[in-house]
Amino acid sequence: VLSSTDKSNVKAAWDKVGGNVGEYGAEALERMFLSFPTTKTYFPHFDLAHGSSQVKAHGKKVGDALTNAVGHMDDLPGALSALSDLHAYKLRVDPVNFKLLSHCLLVTLANHLPNDFTPAVHASLDKFLASVSTVLTSKYR
């Protein structure tokens, strides 16, 4: 459960991300594909080369979904219901991949926001991404 401090930390950090949400989302995806090559199997139709327009477009989708989640931290299940259905029933993404992408997002944010990425902010973002991952995998049960 996200505390009021966690929510405040997440909102403040996400405000710093601002218009870079798509760029950071794409960078996190690239990190994931490089660090965890098995994740590429979900994207056989993508050009996974650095700077690929398909990775950039999907990175923007990831970033926009997280922006939506940040705006609805009190109702993540409601805000992410359609996305949860998509990943569970249509795409059948292995739940572990959400943890891998979350890790890559944290690394990306730490890289771009070094002065703002305090231990407290890191912990809050980690809890937030874990909550998002839990919601996205809730329909698997």
Curated annotation (Swiss-Prot):
Query: Known Gene3D superfamilies for this protein?
Result: Globins
Which positions does the record annotate as the modified residue N6-acetyllysine? Answer: K16
Keyword annotations for this protein? Acetylation, Heme, Iron, Metal-binding, Oxygen transport, Phosphoprotein, Transport
The Gene Ontology CC terms held by the record are: blood microparticle; haptoglobin-hemoglobin complex; hemoglobin complex
Extract the InterPro entries matched here.
Globin, Globin-like_sf, Globin/Proto, Hemoglobin_a-typ, Hemoglobin_oxygen_transport, Hemoglobin_pi
Name positions with the PTM Phosphoserine.
S3, S35, S102, S124, S131, S138
The record's Pfam families line, in alphabetical order, gives: Globin
Positions carrying Phosphothreonine? T108, T134, T137
Globin domain boundaries: 1-141
User: Quaternary state and partners of this protein?
Assistant: Heterotetramer of two alpha chains and two beta chains.
PTM sites of type N6-succinyllysine: K7, K11, K16, K40
Question: What processes does the entry annotate via GO biological process terms?
Answer: hydrogen peroxide catabolic process
Give a brief account of the tissues where this protein occurs: Red blood cells.
- Which SUPFAM superfamilies would you find in this protein's record? Globin-like
Instruction: List the molecular function annotations (GO) for this entry.
Output: haptoglobin binding; heme binding; iron ion binding; organic acid binding; oxygen binding; oxygen carrier activity; peroxidase activity
Please give the superkingdom of this protein's source: Eukaryota
What residues does heme b bind to? H87
User: What name is this protein filed under?
Assistant: Hemoglobin subunit alpha
Q: Which family does it belong to?
A: Belongs to the globin family.
List modified residues, type Phosphotyrosine: Y24
User: Where do the annotations place O2 binding?
Assistant: H58
